[in-house]
A protein has these predicted regions:
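Nucleotidyl polymerases of mobile genetic elements and RNA viruses
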Residues: 1-188
């Protein structure tokens, strides 16, 4: 169990545009404390070592020896080949708007369980995501502290890897649809 306050975060709102007019014009960044960041970095470094073996090859972001541009190049090749052979083609492009905010913690834990992560690992990750509290910095002054209910924090070293695990669930569903002939895959 994490010590109370260890998982506290200040959320700073960084403008995305020159003259922000509404909340969507800001990007929330989590400013986590040093002790939590060290703990999260240790866990993230361990996840980094095994992430390539637990997620599909089609996932390329944040994975050692994989290039994020590979997906774009493969998609381009598939479209070119389909045009040349006059085959019908449907592509799925998933836009993860507010991607980290959308991750449900129980879903993440379920995915990790299905991937056979040890119970202790799942408990550590759950402690890191489920015990977080935050305060928004408004004009440099913090608001009242509140518990975070879902999502992953921008700026947390674990977030990219946990998001990959959550996204792998969608990848597994897409593969199942192909295996059940609901969609036909395109061989590259």
């Amino acid at each position: 169990c994490l010590i109370k306050g260890l998982n506290f975060t200040f959320i700073a709102l960084i403008p995305k545009v020159g003259s922000p007019q509404c909340l969507n014009d800001f990007r929330p960044i989590s400013l986590v404390g040093s002790l939590y960041k060290i703990l999260a970095k240790v866990l993230a470094n361990r996840l980094r070592l095994i992430i390539g073996s637990v997620i599909s090859e089609s996932q390329t972001a944040f994975v050692k020896d994989r290039q994020i541009l590979d997906g774009i190049l493969i998609a381009n090749e598939v479209v070119d080949e389909a045009r040349k052979s006059k085959k019908e083609l449907m592509l799925f492009k998933v836009d993860y708007e507010k991607a980290y905010d959308s991750v449900d913690w129980d879903y993440l834990d379920d995915v990790m369980g299905r991937m056979s992560f040890p119970t202790m690992w799942r408990k550590w990750i759950k402690e890191c995501v489920c015990t977080a509290t935050a305060s928004v910095l408004v004009n440099g002054s913090p608001t009242n502290e509140f518990p975070l209910k879902r999502g992953l924090r921008q700026g947390d070293p674990l977030s990219p890897f946990l998001f990959l695990l959550a996204a792998e669930g969608l990848n597994v569903l897409m593969k199942a649809m192909v295996e059940n002939n609901l969609f036909t895959g395109y061989s590259v």
